[in-house]
Each structure stands twice: as structure tokens, then as C-alpha cells.
């Protein structure tokens, strides 16, 4: 998952 590798991606993923 994006969140797993990049925190920024996590913000967009949520």
C-alpha cells in the first residue's frame, strides 16, 4: 500500500 511506503500517499489514500 502507498501508506506503507510514503506517508504523503497515505494522506491522499485515506
Curated annotation (Swiss-Prot):
User: Is Secreted among the key words of this record?
Assistant: yes
On tissue specificity, the annotation reads: Expressed by the venom duct.
User: GO MF terms on file?
Assistant: toxin activity
Q: Report the PTM annotation.
A: Contains 2 disulfide bonds that can be either 'C1-C3, C2-C4' or 'C1-C4, C2-C3', since these disulfide connectivities have been observed for conotoxins with cysteine framework V (for examples, see AC P0DQQ7 and AC P81755).
Q: Which sequence positions carry the modification called Valine amide?
A: 14
Key words, A-Z: Amidation, Disulfide bond, G-protein coupled receptor impairing toxin, Secreted, Toxin
Query: Which cellular components does GO assign to this protein?
Result: extracellular region
Q: Which domain of life is it from?
A: Eukaryota
Q: Where in the cell is it found?
A: Secreted
Q: What is known of its domains?
A: The cysteine framework is V (CC-CC).
User: Extra notes?
Assistant: Negative results: 5-10 uM of the toxin does not have activity on 30 different class A receptors of GPCR, voltage-gated sodium channels (Nav1.2, 1.3, 1.4, 1.5, 1.6, 1.8 and the insect channel BgNaV1), voltage-gated potassium channels (Kv1.1, 1.2, 1.3, 1.4 1.5, 1.6, Kv2.1, hERG and the insect channel Shaker IR), muscular and neuronal nicotinic acetylcholine receptors (4 subtypes) and neurotransmitter transporters (3 subfamilies).
Q: What does this protein do?
A: Interacts selectively with the G-coupled somatostatin sst3 receptor (SSTR3). It displays antagonist property for SSTR3 (Ki=1.5 uM). Other somatostatin receptors are also affected, but with a lower selectivity: SSTR5 (Ki=80.2 uM), SSTR1 (Ki=169 uM), SSTR2 (KI=159 uM), SSTR4 (Ki>100 uM).
Family the UniProt entry places it in: Belongs to the conotoxin T superfamily.
Q: What is this protein called?
A: Tau-conotoxin CnVA
Organism expressing this protein natively: Conus consors (Singed cone)
Amino acid at each position: 500500500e502507498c501508506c506503507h511506503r510514503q506517508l504523503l500517499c497515505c494522506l491522499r489514500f485515506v
